[in-house]
């Protein structure tokens, strides 16, 4: 059996994920493995896809191996998926699976991205392995990697695969331009940045959405089109920026980001759905923001989305947008699409975003935000010697304050309550008054509110 490994890491042979693949290769000597370093050599495959096409055609199993970069695959692998789908070659019926290494920060959205695109190509997708970066160094991690691939072979032998979720696509509605008189008589101070990757040649649905939003928003807007920025390449995972936030690429993106985008009072992302995501350029933009490390430098600023395409059929993309705003500490003012009622949704987004900016409106984090930041908190605390700027930022903003071992008073109180609850006589005497005791601090809040 022939396995083609698509190594999506820009570090090539030095990829931690690839070491897991090599370990599996040693454990299954009767299986032939071949690796394409698509992350490191993406420019080569952009120029000539023929070699990759031949390797893909000859493979029985296509194995995507990559580190998770900002919720998804590295931008270089995202681009290779585009090339696969654009090549026109027939891969239907072949098996595909994936191996990732990360600290489990939104590995689920990365895996779903690959699964969805495999479904588009008619590949029979098998559930992948999501490993911690340190797993291969442990006996359990090595055992899990070997068991994973043995299970993959069993599934292939029996012809099993994950079901494809796709059905039909609903038609989209053209956006009606807002008349000039619909614009506010006077703009409020502050600028909202609209980041897009649209092709500005000719009229398109996304352009109409952006224009209506700009008319209805009571703030000045600045459009930043990623197509016009001369990206030298994607994030290389080299950690050159860990010390002072300066990227190893000399294209000036780090300065451009901080001066032209992060200075806005709010940020709106406008895109057309491509390959179940925001498109390759937006992934390039996301990955290159690692010049900010794990620092949520725009927290407190609201965000919004203008989406051209069938968002209702993209649950993974919906989760990604909400999770990104939650982790970043940005209030998600809304997502307007051109599926059902585009004018109403765009107008509502404009008004809601304006309210959030004017009133500095923020909400507490949900599971996406709390869970994601706890992973980052633990990671940065362990790696503070390398990621010094991140560590300094986390200390200054109280990200370490919720370490459970710091709340010794609460821990001691729970021990006391637990000991009291063991006393049967006391428990019987208290009856249902336990909940009354729990609510005492909350009752005091209401009493204090009455006094004010």
Regions found by a protein language model. Name each.
Residues 1-87, 146-153, 164-291, 347-355, ...:
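N-terminal beta1-alpha1-beta2 submodule of the flavodoxin-like/Rossmannoid cofactor-binding fold
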Residues 13, 43-45, 106, 135, ...:
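Generic structural signal for helix capping and beta-alpha/helix-loop junctions
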Residues 109-110, 140, 205-206, 280, ...:
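A short secondary-structure junction signal
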Residues 120-167, 327-361:
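A charged, well-structured terminal subsegment
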